[in-house]
């Protein structure tokens, strides 16, 4: 613990909070006085060091050796702690890498600067030049010879965010959360590393990164409700994309045999701990592969992300260990139901009337047009999905719920499709792609019929995509990985809002 922390902190957010409006008014008066003295927000200081690199390089150096070297440093950051003691003071400065303590004396910085410093507040952004030394307690610190105020903070920082009462504030004012919570900062640094590792993995396997439209004339590529907007110049109703799939497959038709995209999808659906209407997905397509190749490849990609974020393929999520280094289990939908809900017989699982009655017990009202495969999938979602804690591929999805996937040669009622579940959540969805234009057109027509029967998540008919397939698409495998859910897993975050910098919120007023 630093010397600044050992003493009573001069902190507006003490146990007895003053009226925030009063504090803001006081700070505005201070800013007014600073403006009258000259440049209130200077921009001519350039830090030469960051806190963490100084700790890494000099924490282990003995005090005498450090003093003899007289190492000059220049740092800048936000003042998080402050302790004034007559003619000498300590403060803690936080930059992008961490925190370091500074030591200020009237003798070293001059009377005018020292008197000004005493009026500065927590949250102010300051700059300091000086030399490194160790305090009596062994704390690496900067003995300041030059001190400047770069930005006056008008709002007091909270002492901390604590408990569920402040959860909404954390999401709504993420900028404050990032200032005061090291855990939050670590989460989003890890997210950046995960995305970078996935991108590097894809590029190392000769995939081409592309960007496809966010505004679609016809929504497609997934079963979901779209957001609708209007293109004024074209006087055209358009849809925020729910998936990039159909455009990426057009690129495979065009000869880009390995493509991927990391970008946003938008689905006009509910909010939950695992759903945000705006979310990040990586989709990739590889010609001359199938769903079995994809499963092996997806495993390797997720392991690479885990090692980048956690340093190991063995991670902990919500107090339980997960080994992403072991081969992932593979089960059919029926196999998963029988494993996790063994009370059901094969005969019952093949009886549509029974399945409809059983689903009612879970509060699921199955639409009349749903066939056996869709009913089996619905029962799987109610009985087995949440129990798939360890990485598990659910394979062989019914054709009727997989309108873009290739049917199995051995059983045309199922497709060469998988979904990957970890901790009871879907992380990835992939399949051998349907490249038969006539079969795809027939499935689109079936989706249109389902939409007319009341299924508002069924797909539209996309004539241009059919035209693309008619030019010929090679045998192809494709997969989508939910980046947000993967980041949740690898950062031990219980809610998707914890891994999205600015999640959707209701208006404050």
Swiss-Prot record:
Its cofactor is Mg(2+). It catalyses: tRNA(Lys) + L-lysine + ATP = L-lysyl-tRNA(Lys) + AMP + diphosphate. Mg(2+) 1 binds at residues 419, 426. It comes from the Bacteria. Keywords: Aminoacyl-tRNA synthetase, ATP-binding, Cytoplasm, Ligase, Magnesium, Metal-binding, Nucleotide-binding, Protein biosynthesis. Its main location: cytoplasm. GO terms for cellular component: cytosol. Disulfide bonds: none annotated. One of its GO terms (biological process) is lysyl-tRNA aminoacylation. SUPFAM superfamilies: Class II aaRS and biotin synthetases, Nucleic acid-binding proteins. Binds 3 Mg(2+) ions per subunit. One of its GO terms (molecular function) is lysine-tRNA ligase activity. Its EC number is 6.1.1.6. Mg(2+) 2 binds at residue 426. Pfam families: tRNA-synt_2 (PF00152), tRNA_anti-codon (PF01336). Belongs to the class-II aminoacyl-tRNA synthetase family. Homodimer. This is Lysine--tRNA ligase. It comes from Methylobacillus flagellatus (strain ATCC 51484 / DSM 6875 / VKM B-1610 / KT). The lineage of its organism: Bacteria, Pseudomonadati, Pseudomonadota, Betaproteobacteria, Nitrosomonadales.
């Amino acid at each position: 613990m630093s010397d600044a922390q050992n003493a009573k902190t001069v902190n507006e957010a003490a146990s007895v909070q003053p009226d925030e409006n009063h504090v803001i008014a006081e700070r505005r008066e201070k800013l007014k006085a600073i403006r009258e003295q000259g440049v209130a927000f200077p921009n001519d200081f350039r830090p030469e060091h960051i806190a963490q690199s100084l700790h890494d390089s000099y924490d282990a150096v003995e005090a005498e050796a450090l003093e003899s070297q007289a190492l000059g440093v220049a740092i800048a950051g936000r003042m998080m702690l402050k302790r004034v003691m007559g003619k000498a003071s300590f403060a803690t400065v936080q930059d992008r890498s961490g925190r370091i303590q500074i030591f200020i004396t009237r003798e070293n910085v001059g009377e005018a600067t020292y008197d000004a410093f005493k009026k500065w507040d927590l949250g102010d952004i300051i700059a300091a030049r000086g030399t490194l030394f160790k305090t009596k307690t062994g704390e690496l610190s900067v003995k300041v010879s030059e001190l400047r105020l770069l930005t006056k903070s008008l709002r007091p920082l909270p002492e901390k965010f604590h408990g569920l009462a402040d959860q909404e504030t954390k999401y709504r004012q993420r900028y404050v959360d990032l200032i005061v919570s090291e855990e939050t900062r670590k989460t989003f640094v890890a997210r950046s590393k995960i995305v970078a590792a996935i991108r590097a993995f894809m590029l190392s396997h000769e995939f081409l990164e592309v960007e496809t439209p966010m505004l679609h004339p016809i929504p497609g590529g997934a079963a979901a409700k779209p957001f609708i907007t209007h293109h004024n110049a074209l006087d055209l109703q358009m849809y925020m994309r729910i998936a990039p799939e159909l455009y990426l497959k057009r690129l495979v038709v065009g000869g880009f045999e390995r493509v991927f995209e990391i970008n946003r999808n938008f689905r006009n659906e509910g909010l939950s701990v695992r759903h945000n209407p705006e979310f990040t997905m990586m989709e990739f397509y590889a010609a001359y592969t199938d769903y079995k190749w994809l499963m092996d490849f997806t495993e390797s990609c997720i392991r690479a992300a885990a090692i980048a974020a956690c340093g190991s393929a063995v991670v902990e999520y919500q107090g339980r260990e997960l080994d992403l280094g072991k081969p992932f289990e593979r089960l059919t939908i029926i196999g998963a139901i029988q494993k996790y809900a063994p009370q059901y017989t094969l005969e019952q699982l093949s009886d549509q009337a029974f399945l409809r009655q059983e689903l009612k017990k879970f509060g699921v009202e199955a639409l009349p047009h749903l066939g056996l495969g869709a009913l089996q999938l619905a029962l799987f979602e109610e009985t087995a999905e949440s129990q798939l804690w360890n990485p598990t591929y659910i394979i062989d999805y019914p054709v009727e719920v997989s309108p873009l996937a290739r049917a199995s040669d051995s059983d045309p009622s199922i497709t060469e499709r998988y979904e990957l579940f970890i901790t009871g959540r879907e992380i990835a969805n992939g399949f051998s792609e349907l490249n038969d234009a006539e079969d795809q057109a027939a499935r689109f027509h079936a989706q249109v019929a389902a939409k007319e029967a009341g299924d508002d998540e069924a797909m539209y008919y996309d004539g241009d995509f059919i035209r693309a397939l008619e030019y010929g698409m090679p045998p192809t495998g494709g997969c989508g990985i939910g980046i947000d859910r993967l980041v949740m897993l690898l950062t031990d975050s219980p809610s998707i809002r914890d891994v999205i910098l600015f999640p959707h919120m209701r208006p404050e007023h």
